């Protein structure tokens, strides 16, 4: 460990020496810019923008732009960034993480790289953990940016789409991580480009970067659609499907496991559901229910594909013949089977779109972050986000007294000691911040302090605005604040009058967190900006971390030292080392777990990029989507011909090709087997595509203008893509949950997931092609399509 620390320190020293040279260039402009009038300083912004347009890079502009922001901060905010803050700003501009201790002015540090990068006009996002901090920083720092001629937007959950669009179109946008993620997902669900709110993701500076990119890395952002109210539709579709006659109303293709309505079946469906045209784009949802009802009734076999047990439809694994507990068919097929068998139809909320923070933030062209604690996770930041963690020196030397851990045999004896310490420090008026890992612990400790008549405040994360006030007052003389898991990040604890004289803020940890980083955050609340302060952790052999790791060795150590008294205390570097080694093991496990999630999510990321890219192409198109639709139809035709016209001509199934053409492309009486006889597979494909071209031309004539045709094409493609994509997300989720079992068969679950996921994606693309073909070719176009 000592060697690793040494390497870190030496590597940082080299980096800081390199950054010092750039920072010195910034400081060299101080006198010159200090003499400029306000108007001349403000005129620098349009000058920089012009120079950027003419080819100067942001790196070229850095010294002057940083000097401008620095002088502006002095005039507008009354704050003048120190040399170390310039260093931090350069690290952020370079797309790395600036590790700056609490109280070193991270918010002011960010103003310089934010201003510099906003010059490009491509947008800068300042990302915070909650809306309170977002609004606070945007309001305070916004004064500086506005003065320098930059626009500032605040994004929030309550904002309307118009307000969000305005916020994202500003030069600088303040937002929470969650809201950026949900806006990204919603933008990829809209039908019209004017409904989108975001611009391409350009540059983000994440405040408390470890909290967002590590602690919340595994949290998926999910937009769910309500599928309630669909039970009735499954039942109606099922009742209709049961009235049909094989080969008269529908045709089954066992090879491809598909079932399609024939013209008579379509006519019956239109009569049954009271429709003019079953394949009108307004009936996409009904078509879905009908398709699933047909599959459930005429493809899926009871006691082969599924069994009914205790009023539930359970899937049978086709390989093992075993029941697959907890698994459900996706795409609504399971509900269709439940309707078929008259058992209770289980509603499901449907995932419409999802993404993890890991993959959201990796989409930015440039990403940077700042925090007081990131060095312990350096490897993860480098490997997953390609960001280095650079420790920025403090402006004043740190004099906080970090004491070795105190270890007690029992929880009871530990808390007795904690309460005793609080009493002693409270008597001399020294303010205290007491960190607990769990809410129950903070409530227990609060109860103990009530018994001792010690006034105190308990902090939980329910009210961010109030929380910030409580944390800000935690440095006043005599204040006692109990905080769970570092509530109040982002707010400085400033020392009140007379507090330095009694030793500054005392931080007391009531147990070690499983992450060293969280412990370091707690310690870091004391001793800001060269203030005095103290930190002390109290542990017991009954703490969670000690029970899980390393406790045996420590017990043996205590026995060797003949420690039998419950109130005995041990203060030893060996104890601290043991605890840190336990923490490192947990951190390693957590990192492996996050990396594992990312490897699985990367499969979805690649697929998401393809689908969202296609959606973007469709939404942004302004002339015609014929170049998109025609290849989809061509691929569908080719797949069908290849499936049914393989090998010798005597084995070809021309009836199946005709059935396909009638179901998905042309009027039923307009094509027969005679039209295809004597043709090679390539000639059949050419013949069918020729028919497609004619139908396309007819549709174009039916509409007033190209704009109407484009609108029709967009609606068809987007409805089909979105319907299949949401089903695919569900299917991939189910695959992900079940794939671990393959590990028992000596198969690599990740490789299996990648392979099956790719296959499912290919199948989905084929389904999208087919449904787009069917909807586009079979729809009757009404005049004047309404949005």
Swiss-Prot record:
The keyword rRNA processing does not apply. It catalyses: ATP + H2O + cellular proteinSide 1 = ADP + phosphate + cellular proteinSide 2. It is an enzyme of class 7 (translocase). It holds the Pfam family SecA_DEAD. ATP binds at residues 85, 103-107, 492. It is a peripheral membrane protein. The keyword Cell membrane applies. SUPFAM superfamilies: Helical scaffold and wing domains of SecA, P-loop containing nucleoside triphosphate hydrolases, Pre-protein crosslinking domain of SecA. GO terms for biological process: intracellular protein transmembrane transport; protein import; protein targeting; protein transport by the Sec complex. GO terms for cellular component: cell envelope Sec protein transport complex; cytosol; plasma membrane. Keywords: ATP-binding, Cell membrane, Cytoplasm, Membrane, Nucleotide-binding, Protein transport, Translocase, Translocation, Transport. Its EC number is 7.4.2.8. One of its GO terms (molecular function) is ATP binding. PROSITE patterns: SECA (PS01312), SECA_MOTOR_DEAD (PS51196). Coiled coil: none annotated. Gene3D superfamilies: Helical scaffold and wing domains of SecA, P-loop containing nucleotide triphosphate hydrolases, SecA, preprotein cross-linking domain. It comes from the Bacteria. PANTHER family: CHLOROPLAST PROTEIN-TRANSPORTING ATPASE, SECA INNER MEMBRANE COMPONENT OF SEC PROTEIN SECRETION SYSTEM. Monomer and homodimer. Part of the essential Sec protein translocation apparatus which comprises SecA, SecYEG and auxiliary proteins SecDF. Other proteins may also be involved. This is Protein translocase subunit SecA. It comes from Lactiplantibacillus plantarum (strain ATCC BAA-793 / NCIMB 8826 / WCFS1). The lineage of its organism: Bacteria, Bacillati, Bacillota, Bacilli, Lactobacillales. The gene is secA.
